[in-house]
Amino acid sequence: MLKYHENGGISFLSISALGRIREAMDLLLEDNKIEWQGSLRATYDKYFHPDVLDLTSKEMFDMLSNGDIFDAFQMSSLVARNAMRKIKPETFDEVAITNTIIRLQTDGEQPIDKFVRYKKDIQEWYNDMNKYGLSKEEIRLMEKHLLPRTGICDTQEILMNIIIDPDIADGGLGFANKFRKSVGKKDQKKIANACSEFYEVMKSNGQSEKFAQYIIEEQFALQFNYAFSLPL
């Protein structure tokens, strides 16, 4: 199941995942931890299908945090394993956030450290918004898009949703996609132009400059050196 990208490259991530699943199945069958169900598909459906996995297992998340899982998919690098120890994910969403946030790099406080700070005490996020002088309504709008991500705009989809939101920028899909492409290509000149346009769009929609400044400096800027898509 090869995936072709825009640049003509091929991703072998799907093949890698399938290999891990098959090896795990063979080892579990060998040790009589699971039973063969008559076919590969039936055995997979009974024991490995996402619908039958317990994605709330505290034991599993503890193993991830402690580094006891040697080769978790896309989380096997030293950087990812260290991030797991630091973030200590307690939900599958937090694992997904870890996978995106380790790729983000900024000047000053790093996104992973900001996320850990917010996770330990979400009031820290509100304190940061208050430092920019955001109103209660502006904070509510940020909660709408960012509270599920613990106060961090870590994916292109969230960035676009904020731009499109009629109660924030009302920038439309065209401008949101233009901003996304600028970030995705890491073109600093295009990013600067997109930011300038964002300030104008926000102003035209009756928003304060400090609100636009917070969104650009504290949220969108997290992706200016690397942009990641929301995991499915």
What kind of region is each of these model predictions?
Residues 1-232:
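Mg2+-dependent phosphoryl-transfer active-site scaffold
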